[in-house]
């Protein structure tokens, strides 16, 4: 029975701006703590896509019935900003690992756009050995830490876009490329050939893409080595960094006021799903798990609602709708 002294458990999404150094599971625990301190009833909390402790940015936090949709966030595309420092490769492919190789080469700034273009589309990528991928039931990072040699299986991922944000340039070198006569002309003042020590990129990627691996491969394609020194997720599925709130701000707000106005509705995680409006009788049938027939709607996934409140996700095929996932929201009950 609900505790009358506690606020009802919320249902929806919090978009957290996860700080660097905090794991996704730790972020979930922190939100649970904030809800308890805010006087809310026990609430189921989950996240919509792991963000490494060394990364920061958008982490969708699912509350209550929205946790039933958290898996959809795992399949959603993501957008990241990240910086590659050239010259060193580490075992973890980020700044926390041990340097395993060095290169004195730096890529020409002018060469970078053409190389980035080769990574757009479906590519084959080898995940980092320091990753959560399971190998024979064990996490790859646990095997790597124990000193085992690991062969990571390449996977197909999609890079929807990859663009340069800005670069950090070293002292300019001057081009010794030949003139039209195929040799340098001492009377011509040559333009400096700018070399990049680091570059910041923005990548829009499919599920399963490892930014650390992408950074490694971009550096290799530029004829050098590199590792990630900065990583921020700016979009996950429909959720953007403009909607995100820091954990510190969330804790401060919860001390003096309700946080309901920070919570996005459950359907915010389904912005690409068309709605199907139910009447009370069809809503009752859906809640009982019955099939709806003779619907004029197109095939595919639909969000069924009653009085603008989500009732279920329905899969329609040939005019027949079956329940994929039902929602037990308190406002649905008649």
PLM features per residue range, with description:
Residues 122-127, 154, 224-230:
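Short, structured loop/turn "capping" segments at alpha-beta junctions
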Residues 69, 139, 144, 198-238:
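Pseudouridine synthase
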Residues 163-196:
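Intrinsic disorder/low-complexity segments
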Residues 61, 82, 137, 214, ...:
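Residue-level signal for inorganic ion chemistry
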Residues 1-40, 44-51, 116, 166, ...:
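Accessory RNA 3′-end/elbow-binding domains used by RNA modification enzymes
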Residues 44-74, 129, 142-146:
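Glycine/acidic-rich beta-strand-loop module
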Residues 131, 135-162:
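Extended alpha-helical targeting/anchoring segments
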Residues 70-127:
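Acidic, low-complexity central loop/insert segments
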């Amino acid at each position: 029975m609900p505790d009358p002294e506690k606020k009802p458990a919320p249902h929806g999404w919090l978009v957290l701006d996860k700080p660097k150094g905090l794991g996704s599971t730790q972020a979930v625990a922190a939100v649970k703590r904030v809800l308890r301190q805010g006087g809310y009833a026990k609430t189921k909390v989950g996240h919509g896509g792991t963000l490494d402790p060394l990364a920061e940015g958008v982490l969708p936090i699912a509350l209550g019935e929205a946790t039933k949709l958290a898996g959809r966030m795992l399949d959603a595309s993501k957008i990241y900003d990240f910086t590659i420092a050239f010259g060193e490769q580490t075992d973890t492919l980020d700044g926390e690992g041990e340097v395993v190789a060095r290169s004195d080469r730096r890529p020409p700034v002018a060469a970078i756009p053409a190389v980035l273009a080769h990574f757009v589309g479906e590519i084959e990528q080898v995940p980092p050995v320091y990753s959560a991928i399971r190998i024979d039931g064990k996490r790859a990072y646990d095997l790597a830490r124990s000193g085992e040699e690991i062969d990571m299986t390449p996977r197909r991922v999609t890079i929807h876009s990859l663009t340069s944000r800005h670069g950090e340039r070293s002292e300019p070198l001057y081009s010794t490329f030949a003139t039209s006569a195929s040799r340098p002309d001492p009377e011509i003042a040559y333009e400096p050939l700018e070399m990049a020590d680091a570059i910041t990129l923005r990548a829009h990627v499919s599920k399963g893409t490892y930014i650390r691996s992408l950074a490694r491969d971009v550096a290799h394609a530029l004829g050098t080595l590199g590792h990630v020194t900065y990583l921020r997720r700016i979009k996950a599925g429909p959720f953007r960094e403009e909607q995100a709130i820091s954990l510190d701000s969330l804790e401060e707000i919860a001390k003096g006021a309700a946080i309901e106005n920070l919570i996005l509705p459950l359907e915010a995680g389904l912005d690409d799903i068309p709605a199907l409006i139910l009447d009370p009788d069809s809503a009752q049938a859906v809640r009982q798990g019955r099939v709806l027939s003779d619907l004029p709607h197109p095939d595919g996934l639909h969000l069924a609602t009653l009085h603008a409140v989500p009732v279920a996700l329905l899969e329609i095929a040939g005019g027949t709708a079956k329940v994929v996932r039902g929602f037990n929201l308190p406002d649905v009950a008649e």
